[in-house]
């Protein structure tokens, strides 16, 4: 037996777990302010839920999915992202739109582990269905900015945004890219050669050094916008300006999945090395209809909890315990009752079972207790307790019935 975590996974202990839960709980609280409803899906789905939605040229489909056949011979996949499963939920449950859904949990991709990238990772996920208005895009981006401010990292994380335009724009731009990249086909990386056939827009997302110089001179999508696409994008940029959200238009930003149209965006930082995206998302107006639902415009984004953890400074507020020190067998019989009473009044109690009084007082100091409650046969007979203020060393006798009122 190997007593270590699987490569690309990690344990969360103590303060690290408090930080994790702080991020999750903050996101949930902020989601309520924007009218999002909670939604949770299973961590695995039928494989076709993902293959039908993510596009056969995406790295997730071609390289990264954890898939297996169950005992009934069905192909099952651990979710690599949330949107496909949430779309499945929307269709299966016949949810009425417009609707905003918030979800959180683990996802799984077979990637090379590095800072900010694990094979099991956790996301906070926001999806808006049934709103075609660009104001939804603006509101969602402002929500990300709100989260960044809450986490105290808004100054180090910058918004990059692009528009892929409508269907007509994407078709024309696709043709232009095929024409351009075909001239350099022999110089492209193997991944980009494959993408040239399946989805040339994805070449723009390549991190391969062989591709970068070729990509730099590629046609710009803004030259192929229809008037509708151009107007839609302009409204979003104007809205961001009104909200004083700084941005950079990145013409090469396409995101890693094939279902996007119109708005795509990433909130990026240099503090995570190569894995610079903290939050990312975009619009996917045709995704729901492409998998059997009715036409439903949609936009969403996700943020990586582990990546946010790398960036934020968070220490849980230390809660100092009450240290319970019974002396003698009779006192020990009453100690559990007292501990239960204190805990049910919201107090953090450590009940020290054994040891000399000196040893237990030393442990109370080590635990940074705010008070010690000491009682033996004498206190039991007089229905009192001795309470010691661990800050000042002051001791006093209190009535057993007034314990809660006398806790420091």
UniProtKB/Swiss-Prot annotation:
List where the protein spans the membrane: none
Which GO biological-process labels does this protein carry? histidyl-tRNA aminoacylation
| EC main group | ligase
As for subcellular location, the record says: Cytoplasm
Q: Name one GO molecular function term.
A: ATP binding
Q: Does the keyword Ligase apply?
A: yes
Q: Quote the subunit structure annotation.
A: Homodimer.
Q: What is this protein called?
A: Histidine--tRNA ligase
Q: Which organism is it from?
A: Wolbachia sp. subsp. Drosophila simulans (strain wRi)
Q: What is the lineage of its organism?
A: Bacteria, Pseudomonadati, Pseudomonadota, Alphaproteobacteria, Rickettsiales
């Amino acid at each position: 037996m190997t007593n270590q975590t699987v490569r690309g996974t990690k344990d969360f202990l103590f303060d690290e777990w408090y930080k994790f839960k702080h991020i999750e709980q903050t996101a949930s609280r902020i989601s309520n302010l924007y009218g999002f409803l909670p939604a949770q899906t299973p961590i695995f789905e039928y494989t076709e839920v993902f293959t039908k939605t993510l596009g056969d040229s995406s790295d997730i489909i071609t390289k990264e999915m954890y898939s297996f056949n169950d005992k009934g011979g069905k192909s099952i996949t651990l979710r690599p992202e949330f949107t496909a499963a949430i779309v499945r939920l929307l269709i299966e449950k016949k949810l009425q739109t417009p609707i905003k859904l918030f979800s959180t949990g683990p996802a799984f991709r077979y990637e090379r582990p590095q800072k900010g990238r694990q094979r099991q990772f956790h996301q906070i996920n926001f999806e808006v269905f049934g709103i075609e208005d660009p104001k939804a895009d603006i509101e969602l981006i402002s929500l990300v900015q709100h989260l960044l401010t809450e986490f105290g990292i808004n100054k180090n994380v910058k918004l990059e945004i692009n528009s892929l335009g409508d269907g007509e724009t994407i078709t024309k731009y696709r043709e232009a890219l095929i024409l351009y990249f075909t001239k350099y086909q022999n110089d492209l990386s193997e991944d980009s050669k494959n993408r040239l056939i399946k989805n040339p827009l994805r070449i723009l997302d390549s991190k391969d050094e062989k591709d970068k110089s070729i990509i730099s001179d590629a046609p710009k999508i803004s030259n192929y916008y229809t008037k509708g696409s151009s107007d839609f994008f302009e409204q979003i940029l104007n809205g961001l300006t009104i909200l004083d959200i700084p941005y950079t238009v990145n013409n090469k930003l396409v995101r890693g999945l094939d279902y996007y149209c119109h708005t795509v965006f990433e909130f990026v930082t240099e503090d995570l090395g190569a894995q610079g995206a903290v939050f990312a998302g975009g619009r996917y107006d045709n995704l729901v209809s492409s998998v059997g639902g009715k036409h439903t415009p949609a936009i969403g984004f996700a943020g990586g909890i582990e990546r946010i953890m790398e960036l934020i400074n968070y220490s849980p507020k230390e809660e100092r315990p009450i240290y319970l020190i019974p002396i003698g067998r009779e006192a020990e019989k009453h100690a559990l009752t007292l501990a239960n009473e204190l805990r049910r009044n919201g107090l953090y109690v450590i009940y020290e079972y054994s040891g000399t009084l000196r040893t237990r007082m030393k442990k109370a100091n080590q635990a940074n207790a705010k008070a010690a409650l000491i009682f033996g046969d004498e206190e039991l007979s007089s229905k009192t307790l001795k309470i010691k203020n661990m800050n000042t060393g002051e001791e006093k006798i209190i009535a057993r019935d007034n314990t809660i009122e006398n806790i420091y």
